[in-house]
Swiss-Prot record:
Record InterPro entries: B_retro_matrix, B_retro_matrix_sf, Gag_p24_C, Primate_lentivir_Gag_pol-like, Retrov_capsid_C, Retrov_capsid_N, Retrovr_matrix, Znf_CCHC
Biased composition regions of type Pro residues, renumbered to the chain: 232-247
GO biological process, one term: viral translational frameshifting
Domains: entry comment: HERV-K Gag polyprotein contains regions homologous to the matrix (MA), capsid (CA) and nucleocapsid (NC) proteins from infectious retroviruses. Evidence suggests that HERV-K(HML-2) Gag polyprotein can be cleaved into mature MA, CA and NC under certain circumstances. However, the exact boundaries as well as the size of processed Gag proteins have not been precisely determined yet.
Family per similarity comment: Belongs to the beta type-B retroviral Gag protein family. HERV class-II K(HML-2) gag subfamily.
GO cellular component: plasma membrane
Domain of life: Eukaryota
PTM comment text: Myristoylation is essential for retroviral assembly. Alteration of the glycine residue leads to a block in the budding of particles and an accumulation of Gag inside the cell. Specific enzymatic cleavages may yield mature proteins.
Name of the protein in question: Endogenous retrovirus group K member 6 Gag polyprotein
Gene: ERVK-6
Biased composition (Low complexity): 624-640
Length: 666
């Protein structure tokens, strides 16, 4: 909290001192603590309030309205804030050039009730010197015809006389009077605190116009008059904003304002109230110098480069954008492009933007790619015909000739454009911590992913991995078809290689894939499945088709066209007429080789292609082979048949198994 108070005190130091002097001279004492609290609330809910302060009563009325809105939303606004706000608003009323009045109704009703109760409790004597704790009446609401304006100005604006370096005799036409510590006479006191009825009576009194000269911190500083066509305006010192020096004459706020640059003033005032006091300035501005002696007509004017640093608001926006969205998010790219192309950025500006917005690791990446891009650009400059005289020191802002801001401000437009292109390219290559850049081959469209999202991912990866613009374009167009899902490929296939010259291929692909995945596309797929309608340049059929006629519903062996042609084809190939009756089945006019009947005309089953013989009897086999019995004396000779049968009858008769005794012997 202490740091916030010290920050507010240092930020509005000049304006706080002016307000305290103004209120003290009016007879109202406000502590510095309460003023700091007031400006804390103003900075919280009114970010457009300028640091140098304002003397415009409309601004303070706007502050009151916004504080009321904040109170309605549940924010707590202390009563001391309303008290100080009403006092300052009332004190600034006499300094307005229009008939503006301050109403006590702007303050909360509770403040007025408390003020009236305290007033009734005090005696009349005490009330004359009492300062209300809640609401102050309009400052200088009474008649101030007899007020010594010179003395009032000398007390309120002592710093102005010191800045001018002249005596108070230049303040007004009357003679100067020595300053005293005693207050003004009772009839000349410009501030009175009276009941609420007196406020309404004093509303009808016209405000008094003063001839004043506020301190230098509160002066309205317009752009240089050389922008309005006034020749001979001396240039501002190097390193400072292009503001003219404060005039030494007195200003009369009642005089009609000049119309020179009034539109520009309105734009600047609007930006100032919105909180961007540097909206109309650039880091480096080029202003035409007045023509010198001996200058010829048609000769290009000489320009002077002046540098202006970035505003804190702009750097803060960059830092918050990088932290919240990432350095290469669409928001940050758009913001960076607007800053880069809307300003004349020198290498020092790019380094300030990167250091204030990026983390140390990200800044190291940016610096590395910056140096790499500079080396590549220098090689191109040397290879150009004729060679471009821009070296690496100039593009990096280093070396003896380009290390200072004043030297970089004199860079040529071609060098500024090269620095811009190199730094934007280096910024695009920055990777978030913990993330890696995938290959463009691995970027594929999901089954339910919209085609524009897939193309955006593909372009982002290709932009980070492919440096050559032409090669990047060709690869993106190829991968936009190859890595798309089957549905998008079917829609893109008729357009592949047929996009007219001058048209963007990716845009045509996106148009062709518009609506895929929606209800209409699903209905078309269903109709396609039923009827086989052509969709996306392909005929999609479901089911089996005939390889002879190409129709769906039957196979080639059942094709009616083929069956009708078989007889004619065979007749022409064999050179003979078909028979009258099949010799095999006796019931059809076809050849016997083509007969497929299983029964003849009498119903008898037909064999295959030829007649079969009688079936053979099955052979019986035993466990042991039977050897024929041959009697002795007939080895090598054929024994008589009677003896063979006699030997067979003498063999033991047993079945497939040997007798038990033989099994035991074995």
């Amino acid at each position: 909290m202490g740091q916030t108070k010290s920050k507010i005190k240092s930020k509005y130091a000049s304006y706080l001192s002016f307000i305290k002097i103004l209120l003290k001279r009016g007879g109202v004492k406000v502590s510095t603590k309460n003023l700091i609290k007031l400006f804390q609330i103003i900075e919280q809910f009114c970010p457009w309030f300028p640091e140098q302060g304002t003397l415009d009563l409309k601004d303070w009325k706007r502050i009151g309205k916004e504080l009321k809105q904040a109170g309605r939303k549940g924010n707590i606004i202390p009563l001391t804030v309303w008290n100080d706000w009403a006092i300052i608003k009332a004190a600034l009323e006499p300094f307005q050039t229009e008939e503006d009045s301050v109403s006590v109704s702007d303050a909360p009703g509770s403040c007025i009730i408390d003020c009236n109760e305290n007033t009734r409790k005090k005696s009349q004597k005490e009330t004359e010197g009492l300062h209300c704790e809640y609401v102050a009446e309009p400052v200088m609401a009474q008649s101030t015809q007899n007020v010594d304006y010179n003395q009032l100005q000398e007390v309120i604006y002592p710093e102005t006389l010191k800045l001018e370096g002249k005596g108070p005799e230049l303040v007004g036409p009357s003679e100067s009077k020595p300053r005293g510590t005693s207050p003004l006479p009772a009839g000349q006191v410009p501030v009175t605190l009276q009941p609420q009825k007196q406020v309404k009576e004093n509303k009808t009194q016209p405000p008094v116009a003063y001839q004043y000269w506020p301190p230098a911190e509160l002066q309205y500083r317009p752009p240089p008059e050389s922008q309005y066509g006034y020749p001979g305006m001396p240039p501002a010192p190097q390193g400072r904003a292009p503001y003219p020096q404060p005039p030494t004459r007195r200003l009369n706020p009642t005089a009609p304002p000049s119309r020179q640059g009034s539109k520009l003033h309105e734009i600047i005032d609007k930006s100032r109230k919105e909180g961007d006091t540097e909206a109309w300035q650039f880091p480096v501005t080029l202003e035409p110098m007045p023509p010198g002696e001996g200058a010829q007509e048609g000769e290009p004017p000489t320009v002077e480069a002046r540098y202006k640093s970035f505003s804190i608001k702009k750097l803060k926006d960059m830092k918050e954008g990088v932290k919240q969205y990432g350095p290469n998010s669409p928001y940050m790219r758009t913001l960076l492009d607007s800053i880069a192309h809307g300003h004349r950025l020198i290498p020092y500006d790019w380094e300030i933007l990167a250091k204030s917005s990026l983390s140390p690791s990200q800044f190291l990446q940016f610096k590395t790619w910056w140096i790499d891009g500079v080396q590549e650009q220098v090689r191109r400059n040397r290879a150009a015909n004729p060679p471009v005289n821009i070296d690496a020191d100039q593009l990096l802002g280093i070396g003896q000739n380009w290390s200072t801001i004043s030297q970089q401000a004199l860079m040529q437009n071609e060098a500024i454009e090269q620095v811009r292109a190199i730094c934007l390219r280096a910024w695009e290559k920055i990777q978030d911590p913990g993330s890696t850049c995938p290959s463009f081959n691995t970027v594929r469209q999901g089954s339910k992913e919209p085609y524009p999202d897939f193309v955006a991912r593909l372009q982002d990866v290709a932009q980070k991995s492919i440096a050559d613009e032409k090669a990047r374009k060709v690869i993106v167009e190829l991968m936009a078809y190859e890595n798309a899902n089957p549905e998008c490929q079917s829609a893109i296939k008729p357009l592949k290689g047929k996009v007219p010259a001058g048209s963007d291929v990716i845009s045509e692909y996106v148009k062709a894939c518009d609506g895929i995945g929606g209800a209409m596309h699903k209905a078309m797929l269903m109709a396609q499945a039923i009827t086989g309608v052509v969709l996306g340049g392909q005929v999609r059929t479901f089911g089996r088709k005939c390889y002879n006629c190409g129709q769906i519903g039957h196979l080639k062996k059942n094709c009616p066209v083929l069956n009708k042609q078989n007889i004619t084809i065979q007749a022409t190939t064999t050179g003979r007429e078909p028979p009258d009756l099949c010799p095999r089945c006796k019931k059809g006019k076809h050849w016997a080789s083509q007969c497929r009947s299983k029964f003849d005309k009498n119903g008898q089953p037909l064999s295959g292609n030829e007649q079969r013989g009688q079936p053979q009897a099955p052979q019986q086999t035993g466990a042991f082979p039977i050897q024929p019995f041959v009697p002795q004396g007939f080895q090598g000779q054929q024994p008589p048949l009677s003896q063979v049968f006699q030997g067979i009858s003498q063999l033991p008769q047993y079945n497939n198994c040997p007798p038990p005794q033989a099994a035991v012997q074995q």
